[in-house]
Amino acid sequence: MFQSTWITHPSAQFSDNRIYLFRKTFTLTEKPASAPLNISAEARYKLFVNGRRAAFGPCRSSGEEKYYDTLDLADYLQAGENELYCEVLGLADNADLTKPSVIFGVRRSGNLLLAVELDCGETVLRTDDTWETAASPYADIAFHNGYARGAMFEEEAHGGTPEWVPAKKAARVDSIREKPYPWGIVNPMFVIPRQIPMMYQKTVPFADAGDGFLIADELTNGFPKFTFEGHGRAKIMYAESFGSGGEKKDRLDRSLSFNGVFDLVDVDGTLTFEPFWFRCARIIRIETEGDVKLTDLVFDEAGYPMTYPETCDFGNDTDNKLWKISVATLMRCTQESYMDCPYYEQLQYAMDTSLQMIYNYQLNNDDALARKAIRDFRLSQRADGLLSSRYPTVEPQYIPSFSFYYIFMVAEHYKRFGDKALVRENLRAIDGVLEWFDGCVDETGLLKRTMYWDFIDWATTWGRTAGEPVVGDDCHMAIASAMYVYFLRLAADLAELCGRTGAAAEYRDRADAVAAAIEEKCWNEKRGLYADETNSVYFSQQMQVWCTLSGIADGERARQIMENAIPLETKCTFAYAYFWFRALEQVGLYHETERMMNRLRGLLDLNCSTIPETPDAPRSECHAWGAIAIYEFAAVVLGVRTVSAAEKKLRIAPHTDGRTYAKGDVYTGCGKVWVEWKIENGIFWLHIESEEGAHKEVVLPNGAVYTTDDAVVDCTIKL
């Protein structure tokens, strides 16, 4: 329970974005064995203990709640004098909330700034008027106008001496209560415990590449600390690569343009500068005026403490490197929430998040971030049932089809972890989503176009429509209609799981009705494809994917449809790779995934250290919806999939095409599984190690299937 008081600057004016400083000096007779700290701030804090950065937060939250962070400061404290020093970003009352910002992705409440509770054993320290505070003289904050400039905001750092004054007590902190609220009135400053681990921090090197350039081995996120000497000004620019848009080729080709978000630093003597918000960069360029010189850079990478198997080998160096950059992509897009990209929006989008979860599940058994994401999107729901396409954020944005991916998140979490209670607590929101779409079905039986952004994928043929399918003068969304069928049927399974058979039957009836309308209005017998609209003019791979996955088409007919889809001009991009691959796999055409996998492998020749947003002319160099290799190498090459965590069922079916060996750990709903296989002289050998109690269906390359509960399995067959 967090017991403390909010403090603020006595002269705080919230007409501008401003960083406020807080400090407290105290003495300990001995270094404590443990020193638990609770801390929260409005809107963001960075905490330093005895000059060392200890934490930043608070964890991003929805408008319904605010988190406080808990960590142990024992390693930072010492016998004798200690200092807690906190930088807190206060947002202007008239802040431009149209900026899609993670800074704005936390609740602003009453302009209260900082609350701390530190138990050092011999003393308990809380924020009160014995703390000192100052308005920072060092930095001006400029938020970006739009997406294109990236990295959130720039700072302009100046010299100056803080004017320290006693802090002002504002209001008590209200956290989890053991007694009922009097009259049911809840304090709007209520805070709840953080649901995810604190972010890790580690130092990574940037090499001096000459001409003011500093280059890291791979794209990274974190806090750079620069030390300058001299008199004049330094401009610090951060970029993901050389080149931009269609100009991008080799990401380290210095003949290409260089542009990026920048910080400006005025130097008069010796100055150490660290931006308030983390920076995303692979390349940093320093430009100076006067006699200013950079004398030191320490870059502390920061992110979610994600673990992953480090002993995997997928049979060739190229795929091992592709695995590595795919994992790096996922890690860069994983902070206090999943995020679409770390350089630009830094926002948790539903489509991106649903895919990131699946990739995350292959690497470890930590579902804390996934559970938080599911909760975040549930809390974003409007009264009419539609979910925000990205959340937390204060700027509402609606991409209707993204609400479907919330259902996907819940279903995949259940398959992987078997948590029926999580399914049950999300059923009401799922029903709300489906009701909203039911209201969009018109007399044709199809979903009509909405007043929002009907984005599906970044197909190049949909460039002029910003990812919306081109449908001519038709006002219907056939692809979204096919998605609706798929997710109605998925939701029916979830409802039935929780004993809501009536809802399940209703969902299936609605799915059958929309499927029949698609068959009648969109099937083109001559092309052997489903059209994206009722005039049979436009066709896409995306439409065939959902008609296959949803069961609108099945069997040999579905296989023929997917074969016909392969040469279509409107192709699935990296964002749709997972669904494209699953549809191909479902009809026995998995070998056709090599076309896109080869595009991903080609990124290695371009010196990419992460997977870009799109295959062609990417804006962002790091979008984890394209980290598909994580899933394919774990679930297909090694062949390990969770069938049902609740029933402790696994399926292990190694895919050997084009390889002679593979090995690695895969995390499942039945714990960690080690698989190793190889082919020598026409003999296939397989070794499996799993935890006790896992029921395994093993499928061999010759089609033989057998089941076993043995923890260790060895088998050999002649091919």
Feature locations, PLM:
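Short, surface-exposed beta-strand-loop junctions and turns on beta-sheet-rich folds
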Residues: 53-55, 242-243, 692-695, 704-705
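Generic structural detector for well-ordered beta-strands
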Residues: 25-27, 72-74, 215, 274, ...
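Active-site core of glycosidic bond-cleaving carbohydrate-active enzymes
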Residues: 348-364, 368-687, 692-704, 711-716
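Intrinsically disordered/low-complexity terminal segments and short unstructured peptides
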Residues: 4-7, 122, 460, 707, ...
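Active-site groove signature of glycoside hydrolases
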Residues: 344-345
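Hydrophobic transmembrane signal anchors and adjacent membrane-proximal interface regions, especially
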Residues: 104, 271, 704-706, 715-717
